[in-house]
From Swiss-Prot:
Gene: Nckap1
Residues passing through the membrane, by range: 995-1015
Family from the record: Belongs to the HEM-1/HEM-2 family.
Function per UniProt: Part of the WAVE complex that regulates lamellipodia formation. The WAVE complex regulates actin filament reorganization via its interaction with the Arp2/3 complex. Actin remodeling activity is regulated by RAC1. As component of the WAVE1 complex, required for BDNF-NTRK2 endocytic trafficking and signaling from early endosomes.
Residue numbers bearing the N-acetylserine modification: S2
Subcellular location: Cell membrane; Cell projection, Lamellipodium membrane
BP term (GO), one: positive regulation of lamellipodium assembly
GO CC, any one term: postsynapse
Listed name of the protein: Nck-associated protein 1
Source taxonomy: Eukaryota, Metazoa, Chordata, Craniata, Vertebrata
Main localization, broad class: membrane
Keywords: Acetylation, Cell membrane, Cell projection, Membrane, Transmembrane, Transmembrane helix
Biased composition (Basic and acidic residues): 651-665
InterPro entries, per the entry: Nck-associated_protein-1
Amino acid sequence: MSRSVLQPSQQKLAEKLTILNDRGVGMLTRLYNIKKACGDPKAKPSYLIDKNLESAVKFIVRKFPAVETRNNNQQLAQLQKEKSEILKNLALYYFTFVDVMEFKDHVCDLLNTIDVCQVFFDITVNFDLTKNYLDLTVTYTTLMILLSRIEERKAIIGLYNYAHEMTHGASDREYPRLGQMIVDYEHPLKKMMEEFVPHSKSLSDALISLQMVYPRRNLSADQWRNAQLLSLISAPSTMLNPAQSDTMPCEYLSLDAMEKWIIFGFILCHGMLNTEATALNLWKLALQSSSCLSLFRDEVFHIHKAAEDLFVNIRGYNKRINDIRECKEAAVSHAGSMHRERRKFLRSALKELATVLSDQPGLLGPKALFVFMALSFARDEIIWLLRHADNMPKKSADDFIDKHIAELIFYMEELRAHVRKYGPVMQRYYVQYLSGFDAVVLNELVQNLSVCPEDESIIMSSFVNTMTSLSVKQVEDGEVFDFRGMRLDWFRLQAYTSVSKASLSLADHRELGKMMNTIIFHTKMVDSLVEMLVETSDLSIFCFYSRAFEKMFQQCLELPSQSRYSIAFPLLCTHFMSCTHELCPEERHHIGDRSLSLCNMFLDEMAKQARNLITDICTEQCTLSDQLLPKHCAKTISQAVNKKSKKQTGKKGEPEREKPGVESMRKNRLVVTNLDKLHTALSELCFSINYVPNMAVWEHTFTPREYLTSHLEIRFTKSIVGMTMYNQATQEIAKPSELLTSVREYMTVLQSIENYVQIDITRVFNNVLLQQTQHLDSHGEPTITSLYTNWYLETLLRQVSNGHIAYFPAMKAFVNLPTENELTFNAEEYSDISEMRSLSELLGPYGMKFLSESLMWHISSQVAELKKLVVENVDVLTQMRTSFDKPDQMAALFKRLSSVDSVLKRMTIIGVILSFRSLAQEALRDVLSYHIPFLVSSIEDFKDHIPRETDMKVAMNVYELSSAAGLPCEIDPALVVALSSQKSENISPEEEYKIACLLMVFVAVSLPTLASNVMSQYSPAIEGHCNNIHCLAKAINQIAAALFTIHKGSIEDRLKEFLALASSSLLKIGQETDKTTTRNRESVYLLLDMIVQESPFLTMDLLESCFPYVLLRNAYHAVYKQSVTSSA
């Protein structure tokens, strides 16, 4: 046959192999999706499960591929109604099967052409040609097997064709051939064994060329270890030498792919197993390595059973069947342990490789081959484990459960990251290699060729010229390289020189083939690093093994030593989109969503695990910190005092209590505490969370650290509220000082997280603690501000109103009074200076402002009630206001007054609330003076230098600022706001003002009644009265200031009027002779002094003019004398 008849360039073998292989993967993707859709009741075409069409579908399948529409009108009647919808909805399925048929036709044509051309195949010489030929054979075989696994194929094709027949009056033109193909390939491998008889020579030649490559790749871990495979440091003297091989692309060729070539290849040309020992050896070695092969994604092929079923009907194949059974036994017994040991070796090898390259990234140049070999080896082992995990024999289950798989995946990801990061380093190296070495060697080889036709010579020369023109400056300038044309030309050249009649035969010039294969690898190191990473380390198959994927992740988190590698699982989600194909765009969204949901789940679980560890550490630290609280030293002090006084207490031999801090004393470094374990586990997990700042998954960016930050915020919020230990039923709550200690411990632990992860923990504190200063947090949950505000108002101050607690000015605290029913809490432990300061630290200015507003709301409700009482007595009070100098008339009018005790009680309650508020404000001022002294001093200057002529609105703004900083003000802005909201629309401002004036009158004339109360006795020790009437001083001054600010009256004048009325009323009880009514007269006199002392508007001179100072002096003398007498 002349060269012109079958000219290689005209056959376009390279182009056809490239296109058909790509199209084959696309067809596999489409068939796979059809199979999965038909297997899912939710996604299955509705016509296949429609009860009305059930009989029609059964009829069509039974008669398939024949078409009979005339005599079966009853069975096909329903089909007639839905024919248009069937045509529309099943078209995609039907034409996918048509495309498969056309693909089959093209493949058969190409295989025949290759046979006619008598193409020479050798994986070590014409690598691209041989690999693509074997890939096409396997893709074609896989496609036909997958087609035969779609059980509904006949129903789909038949339904569509019947609908077409009913609509157009004739079958679809592709139907006869398609129907016959479906029938012919009912048992695909059996049919293909017949079909491949003429192709046996070409296929067996290609497969036998693997005899040097496959056995060398399929070695045990011990052999790898002895050869020090993938080690850069085993021979330091050669560390900088480039990693070279005569078969460069074969070194990282997938073992999984080679096993598929060998298994399927020798099934199709099984005659070679009887005549060729090399073929039999390859076949047996492959059979011993696996129990199943991956057809496509998660579709597997059980090789031993299938091969045995095919060979059992062939005469003279008993020996081959025995071989299969022996190999199956070997695979079941030894394959699991062999692959387990390989994974173990690869973990250490990849770790060493990644560590060395991270320290010396320049070695990525000469040792790039090692990186891609390592990635390919590891990927093969992971995929092997994945497909065998669900198909494992029970007796060796442990070999198929690898709890350390995360470590292997992690080091793969680390190597991938090195390649991406240091791509320019590799580019510089290989650009120089190509121009300075490869171009020279190739030029010499071309020059020494005895025969070189014109076409081949032109291609060779273009190779040399392309490489010679390269320079490092192109890399430095960021130029984009593209050697795809050069690689395709080499593929074409392989096709031209591998046919039997070629002038330049590649079989006779093997050195040229090996050199060009090496050059092609070098070009890929310059322009196709990302594609190389996909080729050697793509693990998108995990997308289709979701359950196994999640199980591996959970095992990784459960094992503390492996949790540092858990980031490998979210990183794998970035691979998923590489398994999509342009021939099946509809699955992109589904796979993208799966990658996003899995990545989100993994990162969320990692953050939760870290959060739980942090919470446990915080709990431990809070427990240790709690041991240092002052309350726990009482027993130690007691023991010391008893020891000093030589008192024998307790039983002999009582064990001495461990002192706080004893846990830090280590006698043996091997002793590991629970806290040590928690810190170790946390550091491991945080390494993983901190490993990458962010990752891109299907056009979304994930930031692992933000997951942790978010979880820490939520947990910190819950913990703070939880640590208050608020019990609504028993009204118990933690002391502010103890909560503050716990919160500070919590914050200390959280701050230490910054040593592990680069997160802004200050942001967490700001977000959480600022929310805790509000009534509700961002989730609508109660905060410590609302809990403590509620407790102080509803529990502590309510008990004060009930007479169980008194405010002691001398101690600046509320103290329990001895009563029949003991309270469940000690008021002093919640209201002394240190507790109020702790409360201010926790709630901050915002929280304390909310507390103040809540207090003022209670005061305003009391004032509203007082106004009602004033309105009831308005006529009497109006007369009393002008008759204070007429004793007899005042006495008569006073008897007409109602609710005198109620007025005093309500004013006392107001005074108690204001006293509590003054404690809170003082504590807030102390806290802010410590934290922001300069700002507080500036606010003080503002407040202290308000000119008297200043507009009241401006003054109130300054007072509001001062009050927020905890500074005392002449007029309380919060009280003014609270009382302003009480203005009634039905009452005129003049009437409101009159009621306010009369309220002060009512209080003034009611004071003498306090003298008859037993509890009104003044106690010098507490500087107050046990019934809290000393709080009236604060109530009178603050209420007067607020009311007359609102009504724009003179505060000073009204207080003078009050002082005149009060002193006149009190002087009258000095003349009383009834001991009951004057029981505590002196103690009540002191109220006048307290009112003046408390007021910024009244002076002692003014008091002297109304009430003789001698009376006050005598009163003080009397109460102090009485106090000494009663204490004695």
